[in-house]
Swiss-Prot record:
Self-association state and partner proteins as the record states: Component of the RNA editing complex, a 1600 kDa complex composed of at least 20 proteins.
Upper lineage: Eukaryota, Discoba, Euglenozoa, Kinetoplastea, Metakinetoplastina
Matches recorded under InterPro entries: RNA_lig_RNL2, RNA_ligase_dom_REL/Rnl2, Rnl1/2_C_sf, Rnl2_C
Gene3D superfamilies: 3.30.1490.70, DNA ligase/mRNA capping enzyme, RNA ligase
Organism: Trypanosoma brucei brucei
List of residues binding ATP: 29-31, 56-62, 79, 126, 173, 269-271
Name by which UniProt lists this protein: RNA-editing ligase 2, mitochondrial
Gene designation: REL2
Enzyme nomenclature, EC number: 6.5.1.3
Functional description taken from the UniProt entry: RNA editing in kinetoplastid mitochondria inserts and deletes uridylates at multiple sites in pre-mRNAs as directed by guide RNAs.
Length: 416
């Protein structure tokens, strides 16, 4: 397959490297992995039933964008420190025009919100992408000029999954600022940061996959969580089998709020077992699911959880149509489906809850597709698959909640 060569040019601009004294650089704190012990600690300190917000953990490289008052040059940082402008880091220079626009917009909105000038505004996020092994997606080889030399843009992660895009992208998840040069950084509460992120055209940011008490969040099955990112970066029509997400980052909803005095951890990683950094023995035996017991108890308490629909479908028109589709799964439709089936499959014990739910889901999809606009029918393949999964999920939930009554009513001896 032919490789396309794209080159972007950037001038080398003198800039004093700052960060060694720590006055500008803010190291992103390592996040603890979730396990039964840490979850029990949350229960013990009364934080378990607080509101928590889970976002997809993107598999990439930590990346910070710094806007400093009085300086035209934006600075960029990896996990270990602010980089000099000529450092090659996966080819991030190709994104500089977009990154500058993002942080400039955030600075303007944040200063207006705070009604004051701010010394530093920092967007924390993840640099990711560079690999997408789909037969219909061309392999590309791009370079970018750094310090007068062409440098190859490389994949940030090379694992078989998750894969996001053949191109490089930035995924924002935090906003911090400091008012004065000698001051400390303040972190915006998640909802405040999202309010700003969503006002910046083209910015990819960490949307809530699920939120609520920890009992609800922990019921989310990270082992079967397919990454939500590809449709957001143009790969929605190119599904990959087994493209599992790395996991979730789960934050306390009040993290960053003035006066919030937590008695336990406020940020945890819920990782898919394949990404957990622990094994059963020192010889690197099979990895273990440290959240298995917690997840089982949470499912018993809150039920199985799917990602919030808004994290999957982000186009407003498509989102409204998706909600309408789920409204097609209702008791009246279930009664109509049962009337078409009759009592014989129930008398012979040939009908199971899953089979009935599948019939209900198919009926809902059929009626929805008859009346919906062509633009909705032709949404990306990955989103269509997700919506089908939601319809089946809602159908199963409705059928299971009424199964005993259904068996009673479908008996030939039943009378009102």
């Amino acid at each position: 397959m032919l490789r396309r060569l794209g080159v972007r040019h950037f001038r080398r601009t003198p800039l004093l490297f700052v960060g060694g004294d720590g006055s500008i650089f803010e190291r992103y704190t390592e996040i603890d992995n979730s396990n039964e012990r840490r979850i029990n600690a949350l229960k013990g300190c009364g934080m378990f039933e607080d509101e928590w917000i889970a976002t997809e953990k993107v598999h990439g490289a930590n990346f910070g964008i710094y806007s400093i008052e009085g300086e035209k040059m934006i600075r960029y940082a990896k996990r270990s420190g602010i980089m000099p402008p000529n450092e090659h880091f996966f080819g991030y220079h190709i994104l500089i025009p977009e990154l500058q626009r993002y942080v400039t917009s955030i600075r303007e909105m944040l200063c207006e919100k705070q009604k004051k000038k701010l010394h530093v505004v920092l967007i924390n996020g993840e640099l990711f992408g560079g690999k997408y092994d789909h037969p219909s997606v061309p392999k590309t080889r791009k370079t970018v000029m750094v310090a007068g030399k062409p440098r190859t843009i490389s994949a940030v992660q090379t694992d078989s999954f998750p894969q996001y895009s053949p191109d490089l992208h930035f995924y924002a998840f935090d906003i911090k600022y400091k008012e004065t040069e000698g001051g400390d950084y303040t972190t915006l509460v998640y909802d405040e940061a999202i309010e700003l992120f969503q006002r910046v055209p083209g910015l990819l940011y960490a949307r809530a996959v699920i939120r609520g008490p920890m009992s609800k969040v922990a019921a989310f099955d990270v082992e079967r969580f397919v990454t939500t990112i590809p449709p957001l970066v143009g790969m929605g029509n190119y599904p990959l089998t087994g493209n599992w997400a790395e996991g979730l980052v789960v934050k306390h909803s009040r993290l960053g709020m003035a006066g919030f005095d937590p008695k336990g951890p406020t940020v945890l990683k819920f990782k898919c077992t394949a990404f957990q950094e622990i094994s059963t023995d020192r010889a690197q035996g099979p990895r273990v699911d440290e959240m298995r017991n917690v997840r089982r108890d949470s499912i018993n308490r809150a039920g199985v959880q799917l990602p919030d629909l808004e994290s999957i479908v982000q186009d407003p028109i498509q989102l409204e149509a998706s909600k309408l589709l789920l409204n097609h799964v209702c008791e009246n439709r279930l009664k109509n489906v049962l009337s078409k089936i009759g009592t014989e499959p129930f008398e012979k014990e040939e009908m199971t809850p899953d089979q009935l739910a599948t019939l209900l889901a198919k009926d809902a999809l059929k009626d929805f597709l008859k009346d919906t606009e062509p633009s909705i029918v032709n949404i990306p393949v990955l989103i269509r698959k997700d919506l089908t999964r939601y319809v089946i999920f809602e159908s199963r939930r409705l059928v299971c909640s009424q199964w005993k009554d259904i068996l009673k009513r479908q008996s030939p001896d039943f009378s009102e």
